[in-house]
Amino acid sequence: VTDATTPSRHALSDIILASAQCLTAVHEGRSLSDVLAQTPPTLKGATQAVSFHVMRHLGQALEVKHMLVAKTPPVPLLDAVLQVSLCLLDTAMVAEQLTREGKPVRPDWPVYAVHTVVDQAVSAVAGHRRMQSFKALVNGVLRRFTREREAILTRARGNPEARWNHPNWWVRRLRQAYPDHWKAVLSAAQLPPPMTLRVNTRKRTVTQFLADLGAAGINAHAVQLEGIAQGADAAVVLEHPRPVQDIPGFAQGWWSVQDAAAQLAAPLLGVQSGMRVLDACAAPGGKTAHLLELADLDLVALDADASRLARVGQNLERLGLASSHVKLTAADASRLDTWWDGQPFDAILADVPCTASGVVRRHPDILWLRREADIARTAALQRKIVKALWKTLKPGGRFLYVTCSVFPQEGESQAQWILEQYPDAVRLDAPGQLLPLPVDGQAAAHDGFFFALFAKQAAVDNNNAS
């Protein structure tokens, strides 16, 4: 998903209203991507750009709104219109100042003139039956912000949620876990990610694909996270994100969209042709495909969501990797009786469900959908899945535990638990916790991930590990 601004035939008032509807849905616990999927096509691009931007700055918008509006508006949509408009207004004022100083404005920002934001926000409520009577409120709040912005923001940023645009509990946990890096991790989440591709080396070399891109006028470069995994050398980063249909070779299966850190998983397992491999929690299939690009495998791709598993099959077809040796199975990984045939696996990739706290720059609504209690809930689910999967690994086999989380309770704590739970588990070299840290103010090269690799020893009494 890219949140690059897309030209729209709609007035800004329409975009503000659509973005406010998205924000209201997120406040109600719905996924932003699900709501955007229902947005009219001509309005979707601009609404997505604004909605993503608001999600990345929602902590400040919420605090400022609370300061300027004594009582929560009786109409939830009006409350969201104020949050969206205050965010756009602040961005407009910052952009004006940068322009006056001759400094560049971030290309991913949805920038409109200050007077346009105020006028169109008022128009948005004026054209809506349930909000018409609040035109003066919206106008007054926004105009006050333009007059008193500096003083208002100074007060607002006394609240860590407004300062860092993360829930307070999230800030606290990262500060405790990473005293030297928590600020950088929080800052990185507010920068849109680069568009990173994984070259299908069965069809193109990285050099060939870079030449393909160059011929199409697309600037890109190869990237490798040094010294982490042999074979993790197929990542290419585009200078500017663009629709997949505009990139050479999509239909031909030359490449897939996949973050650089996610591309480490398959090489870490060290698979070889002929192995029997399980990709648990496989959807949407990026790591499944990568495994098959590396070797000819007897592979089971497992996922509890049948509709998402269907996407795995579609991806494998596009990449030319579908075969009779690849089995897609819709089942709960923790319930062996529903899917396992009793034949052990040589290698298991357990990319288990998590809070997704490491990918919030891609899905900023996660920040406002998650609750602190979700960490313990997902950690319990992760252990339930690992307990089942370990039984299916043959002695001498490899087990890779993966999450896209930055919370240690879903990462290192789980790795230590595996060692305590299973006397036959031996920990091997793997990256451990990868934090998404910005470089020189630019987006981090990769998302937040955790990797722990284990080998299963033979002839160890494991009766107590159940």
Regions found by a protein language model. Give the residues of each.
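S-adenosylmethionine
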Residues: V1-S466
